Amino acid sequence: MGSQQAAVSFLSNLAKAAFGLGTAATVLNTSLFTVDGGERAVIFDRFRGVMDQTVGEGTHFLIPILQRPHIFDIRTKPHTFSSISGTKDLQMVNLTLRVLSRPEVSRLPYIFQTLGLEYDEKVLPSIGNEVLKAVVAQFNADQLLTERPHVSALVRESLITRAKDFNIVLDDVAITHLSYGVEFSRAVEQKQVAQQEAERSKFVVMKADQERRAAVIRAEGESEAAQLISDATAKAGMGLIELRRIEASREIASTLARSPNVAYLPGGQSMLFALNR
């Protein structure tokens, strides 16, 4: 009888000890939280609200039920968004912007209070569209291409300044895509065609001018040659002309002699006399 009571007492004490250990393990487990690399934690206290200090990497203690950690990723993350903006000459332009952002670590408690954990998704698209529309409105549509480095620099400076108002740090800002509306694209094509036609017309005019100059030079040369021949004739008489005529006749006779389909008939009536005999 005594042994049974001792066994029951032992089991009861063992159950109490196991329950105590389990409760202690649960409390200990809920009192610990881990912050991984590239993260920071903001502690919310039910009595004091959001704590001013952020918690760094590693395992830390908190008061169960009264305190709760909220983990922020502080590594640089890419974000891409598009905006349709109007230019100074009232053309619609579609731009795509890529930014690399991260939160300002010392301001994480304030970011959590005002924006929450998804601060970047709430802020960046809004201020990105705002800055793009403001900058694009300062340029004509064609200037966005010819002055693209200047446009990108203005967008970068304005967006970095605007993001600081929300305690967000931008490591890089870049315009990755730029396209125009259908009407402007058609106008650009027509302008290119017109420029090509103008260049072609300019070439035709230059060619005609060169041909005209060549004709003038050729006419002047022929005039000078005729004058020289006239002067030579006046000095030497008709002998020069007869010499040129003989040379031309010799060239013609030489050409005809080499042709197999040409027969030479001597002048006069001697051939006719030979036929009559």
Curated annotation (Swiss-Prot):
Effect of a null allele? Extreme constitutive ethylene response in air associated with a partial loss of ethylene-inducible gene expression and an increased ethylene production. Mitochondrial swelling, decreased meristematic cell production, increased cell division time and reduced cell expansion rates, leading to severe growth retardation. Reduced sensitivity to salt stress and defective in H(2)O(2)-induced nitric oxide (NO) accumulation, light-induced NO in cotyledons, abscisic acid (ABA)-induced NO accumulation and stomatal closure, and in auxin-induced lateral root formation.
GO CC annotations on file: chloroplast; chloroplast envelope; mitochondrial inner membrane; mitochondrion; nucleolus; plant-type vacuole; plasma membrane
InterPro entries in UniProt: Band_7, Band_7/SPFH_dom_sf, Prohibitin
**For the modification N-acetylglycine, which residues carry it?**
2
- What ranges does the Mitochondrial matrix topological domain annotation cover? 2-6
What Gene3D superfamilies does the entry give? Band 7 domain
GO biological process assignments: cell division; defense response to bacterium; lateral root development; mitochondrion organization; negative regulation of cell division; response to auxin; response to ethylene; response to nitric oxide
- Membrane topology, Mitochondrial intermembrane segments: 29-277
Q: What is the effect of changing residue 37 to D?
A: In phb3-3; reduced sensitivity to salt stress and defective in H(2)O(2)-induced nitric oxide (NO) accumulation, light-induced NO in cotyledons, abscisic acid (ABA)-induced NO accumulation and stomatal closure, and in auxin-induced lateral root formation
Record's subunit section: Component of a prohibitin multimeric complex in mitochondrial membranes.
Task: Give the protein's recorded name.
Answer: Prohibitin-3, mitochondrial
